[in-house]
Amino acid sequence: MKDVILIANAGSSSLKISIFAIQNKRVNDKIYNIFLEKNNNKILFYINQQKESTTSIKDDPIEMMINLFEEWWKKQSALNLIATGHRIVHGGKNFNKPVVVNKKVIKELRVLIPLSPLHQPYNLQVLDLFFQKYKAISHIICFDTSFHCTNSPITKAFGLPKQYYDKGIMRYGFHGLSYQYVSSHFKEITMEDLPPKAIIAHLGSGSSLCAIKNGLSLTSSMGFSVLDGVMMATRPGNLDPGVVLYLINNEKMTINEITELLYKKSGLLGMSGESSDMRTLIASNSHDSKFAVDLFVYRIVLEIGKLIAALEGIDCLIFTAGVGQNSPVIREMISKKLSWLGIKIDYEKNQKNEHRISTKGSKIKVFVVPTNEELIIAEEVMKFL
């Protein structure tokens, strides 16, 4: 039998499962890429991008996804599952490194659900189901906030009374698993050393940027929740708190309505009135869609300026995640607005998504490095085995 580990990443309507082979106590190839999603009243089940089945929803969708996976898994007699790894978005102030799952840990993490209502409930539901079904093996949690535990108190604090900081109301930062992968695998991907002062732009449906100093997180654009920072697909990013007070007092909106607005109806979707998909907006002739793209770029450029100030300089800019690693248009727009830094982009290399897209004469190196959060979780899981 072949030893494997399973990496799970759950959303509100989808479940991604990666299965990695283990050889000589090292992570080897990914042998299965499994994706289950809720689509209208059906659950679609894909294995290595090929549709396996379509099932009508008759119960809790996430539970059904796990059950469908389990039915398939029972047929994989040649594979021996030795551990699972799970991405959990928010670790709060108490979890700053990967941990082994137990009931106490799950209970503590449930308290953090209000800080990440789009992700945490589903992350924990899947974790709990695997924990109950596969009790004989280890289950390891990796947190998106852990990478930022090297941030100093001054970068974490809000200008609120200290009692709130003591309660955990502070800046945490997110997308840490992505930043950890890009920074730790940078040399093997680009064949260059990671410079001392780097900024990584994780641009996807959720977007953030991180200042990396000597391989460690110095500060990042996201704060207490995944709403903060640059504008995203459906989230507004940095927002004056007075706007929320106005919506409550003058628009008479409820907390649930505001939550829906900020998490699901703002950002590129809200600004364009057309789509949250960057490819659709770039191709659109709509004035509002063009404005949404321009605002997305503008907010990123402003954030890069803040991070340069925190780093006291910049040696390189790295693009990653769905938009960052696949959209030459967005990379070019951002780079042009940073031309005052001496950034020069090679047009052909940028169009081909090559790893280094800056010219030899560029004062700041610019890279495209695909992220791999599943692999970094798998590598962390192996440290426990």
From Swiss-Prot:
Keywords: ATP-binding, Cytoplasm, Kinase, Magnesium, Metal-binding, Nucleotide-binding, Transferase. It comes from the Bacteria. It is found in: Cytoplasm. One of its GO terms (molecular function) is ATP binding. Transmembrane segments: none annotated. One of its GO terms (biological process) is acetate metabolic process. InterPro entries: Ac/propionate_kinase, Aliphatic_acid_kin_short-chain, Aliphatic_acid_kinase_CS, ATPase_NBD. The active site is at D144. Its main location: cytoplasm. SUPFAM superfamilies: Actin-like ATPase domain. Its EC number is 2.7.2.1. The record marks H175, R235 as: Transition state stabilizer. Substrate binds at R87. Catalyzes the formation of acetyl phosphate from acetate and ATP. Can also catalyze the reverse reaction. This is Acetate kinase. The lineage of its organism: Bacteria, Pseudomonadati, Pseudomonadota, Alphaproteobacteria, Rickettsiales. The gene is ackA.
